[in-house]
UniProtKB/Swiss-Prot annotation:
Pfam families: Phe_tRNA-synt_N (PF02912), tRNA-synt_2d (PF01409). Belongs to the class-II aminoacyl-tRNA synthetase family. Phe-tRNA synthetase alpha subunit type 1 subfamily. It comes from Parabacteroides distasonis (strain ATCC 8503 / DSM 20701 / CIP 104284 / JCM 5825 / NCTC 11152). PROSITE patterns: AA_TRNA_LIGASE_II. It catalyses: tRNA(Phe) + L-phenylalanine + ATP = L-phenylalanyl-tRNA(Phe) + AMP + diphosphate + H(+). Its cofactor is Mg(2+). The gene is pheS. It comes from the Bacteria. Its EC number is 6.1.1.20. Tetramer of two alpha and two beta subunits. PANTHER family: PHENYLALANINE--TRNA LIGASE, MITOCHONDRIAL (PTHR11538:SF41), PHENYLALANYL-TRNA SYNTHETASE (PTHR11538). One of its GO terms (molecular function) is phenylalanine-tRNA ligase activity. This is Phenylalanine--tRNA ligase alpha subunit.
C-alpha cells in the first residue's frame, strides 16, 4: 500500500490540466467519495499496526498535496479568465498623465529669473548648519529668542548643529569664501519649530538676496525692490518701506506692496489697508561683513529675504499654506496652465 501511495503522490505532483473540465475530472478521480484517495482511506484499516504510523503520514501528505494542487490549478484558470474578461480591444487607451512644476517651484523660478536679470547668480548651501553660520556670524545675540528650542530644531546630542532657520547662512558662507563684488540669491528650504496651521508650517521655502560692493546704498536696494515688485506682480504695483529690526541689517525695513487683489483700495485680503507685507530687507550690518572677513570701511551691501509660500499665496490667492505639501492632485492641476 505504501508503494501505491508514493506512486500516486508522484502522479499528483506532476498533475496538469488544460482547462476547467479536465481539472474537475482530476478532482473527481482523486478527491471524490469514490476516488482513489477515499479508497486508500478505506483500506487503511487493514494495514498492519506497526506500519500504520508511516502509512498514515504518507496518506495525509497525499491528500493535502492533491487538494493544494487542485486549488493551485483552479486559481490559475480563474486568473486567466478574469484577465480575458477585462480586455476590451475597442476601449480608448488611458491618457498619459504628464507631470508639471509645483506652484512653489514655479514661483521660485520666476523670482530667480527676475533677480537674474539684475545680475544675481544662484548660491546654495546645506540645510543642516552650525550655530556660527545661522546665528553668530549674523549678529544674533546669545540670548536671542531664535536660539531657543521653542523656535529652532537642534540636532540631538549636538547643540551646535541645527536645521537652518533661514537661508542667510548661505550668504555668510559665500562672503567667507568670495571677495566682493558679491551678487547672489539663495533659494532653499528652511525649518522653524512651529505648529502646523493654515498660515504656518514647520518647514517652508525662502529666497534671500545679497549684494556687496563698494558704495552700495539704500537707494540701490529700493530700486531693486521696486523692479522686483513690478515684474513679479504687475507694472502698477507700488511699494512701501517701513522701519523694522533684524540683527543682520542696519537700517532694516519691511516692504509692503499695494494689494494685488483690490489694487490698493482696501479689501478683506489686505484687511482694508490696501497694503500687503511681502519681505524684509536692509543694509548689511558692518559687524556681519567683518565676521565674514570683509572690510566694512571699504564695502557695503544690502540683503533681502522673502518666503516663497508668501509670494505664491499673493500671486495665486492660496489661502491655506498646508496645500503646498499635501500633494493633492486636484490642487496641483490648477497650476498646469502656469507651466
Amino acid at each position: 500500500m505504501l508503494d501505491k501511495i508514493k506512486a500516486l503522490l508522484q502522479e499528483v505532483e506532476n498533475m496538469k490540466a488544460a482547462n476547467a473540465e479536465e481539472l474537475e475530472a482530476l478532482r473527481i478521480k482523486y478527491l471524490s467519495k469514490k476516488g482513489e484517495i477515499s479508497a486508500l482511506m478505506n483500506d487503511f484499516r487493514n494495514v498492519a499496526a506497526d506500519q500504520k504510523r508511516e502509512v498514515g503520514k504518507y496518506l495525509n501528505e497525499l491528500k493535502e498535496t492533491t487538494q493544494s494542487k487542485i486549488n493551485e490549478l483552479k486559481e490559475s484558470f480563474e486568473n486567466v479568465q478574469t484577465a480575458n474578461d477585462d480586455i476590451d480591444l475597442t476601449r480608448t487607451a488611458y491618457p498619459i498623465e504628464l507631470g508639471t512644476r509645483h506652484p512653489l517651484s514655479l514661483v521660485k523660478k520666476e523670482i530667480c529669473d527676475i533677480f537674474g536679470r539684475l545680475g544675481f547668480s544662484i548660491a546654495e548651501g546645506p540645510e543642516i548648519e552650525d550655530d556660527w553660520h545661522v546665528f553668530s556670524s549674523l549678529n544674533f545675540a546669545e540670548d536671542h529668542p531664535a536660539r531657543d528650542m521653542q523656535d529652532t530644531f537642534f540636532i540631538q546630542h549636538n547643540p551646535d548643529v541645527l536645521l537652518r532657520t533661514h537661508t542667510s547662512s548661505v550668504q555668510t558662507r559665500v562672503m567667507e569664501k568670495q571677495e566682493p563684488p558679491i551678487r547672489i540669491i539663495c533659494p532653499g528650504r528652511v525649518y522653524r519649530n512651529e505648529a502646523i496651521s493654515y498660515r504656518a508650517h514647520c518647514f517652508f521655502h525662502q529666497v534671500e538676496a545679497l549684494y556687496v560692493d563698494k558704495n552700495v546704498s539704500f537707494a540701490d536696494l529700493k530700486q531693486a525692490l521696486l523692479f522686483f515688485a513690478k515684474e513679479m506682480f504687475s507694472p502698477d504695483t507700488k511699494i512701501r518701506l517701513r522701519p523694522s529690526y533684524f540683527p543682520f541689517t542696519e537700517p532694516s525695513a519691511e516692504m509692503d506692496i499695494s494689494c494685488n487683489i483690490c489694487g490698493g483700495k482696501g479689501c478683506p485680503f489686505c484687511k482694508g489697508t490696501g497694503w500687503v507685507e511681502i519681505l524684509g530687507c536692509g543694509m548689511v550690518d558692518p559687524n556681519v561683513l567683518e565676521n565674514c572677513g570683509i572690510d566694512s570701511k571699504v564695502y557695503s551691501g544690502y540683503a533681502l529675504g522673502m518666503g516663497i509660500e508668501r509670494i505664491t499665496n499673493l500671486k495665486y490667492q492660496v489661502k491655506d499654506l498646508r496645500m503646498f505639501s499635501e500633494n493633492d492632485v486636484r490642487f496641483l492641476r490648477q497650476f498646469e496652465s502656469a507651466n
